[in-house]
Amino acid sequence: MVAQPLRRFDTLTDEERAFLCTFPDDTERSPWMVGKDFHRLAIEVLYYPLRRYRADWYVSSDLPILYPRPNNRLGQVAPDILVALVHNHLRDAFDVRVERGFPPFVLEVVSDESRPRDTGKTKKVRIYDLLGAQEYVIFDPRAKRRPSLSGYRRTAAGSWEEWPLDQQGKLQSAVLGLTLAQEDMLLRVEDAAGHRLPTIDEETEELDTLRAELARLRGERS
């Protein structure tokens, strides 16, 4: 799951180059970057299990990804979750020139403010295609009818296609080797055996239970 090389500018059409040059950056002042409590909770439920799952993964949230534009300026996108197999150290930004490619897995938790940008085929769907993502997950917990899970993925031939849910309504990630499953208005991660990866709250609760049981056993022996 190494960073994916960017497409060479000379392989792009004039329209694609123009799109890369003019796509608005994700910045702290962008109205679609405003996070509300529920939006942050949905991200936290994903971030901690993914970061704990493998020590050789680099997992981050809302980190700027810097990429070169055809006009020699830098562009910036900041997915809610990114995963890449690069050196796991703290970063101020994920610079694709330094990392030699784009993160293969990106995920957006949609908010009311970000919905047009995150789901639009002429916006985030397209920029992640042109930048070389292998998988893009879109989770919309507050869609009009019900929570919505969808995505796009890279085929073996290199094309960018809609990512179908399996028969259980889940996404099987080839990049992560994990399954993404809706649970009410949250998105959870499952391993190959179907076991849900615990959140930090669940791990803390389990640890507290074990400590209480240990204290009880010690009390019975005294």
What are these regions (language model features)?
Residues M1-E135, F139-S222:
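Gly/Pro/Ser/Thr-rich low-complexity, intrinsically disordered segments predominantly at protein N-termini
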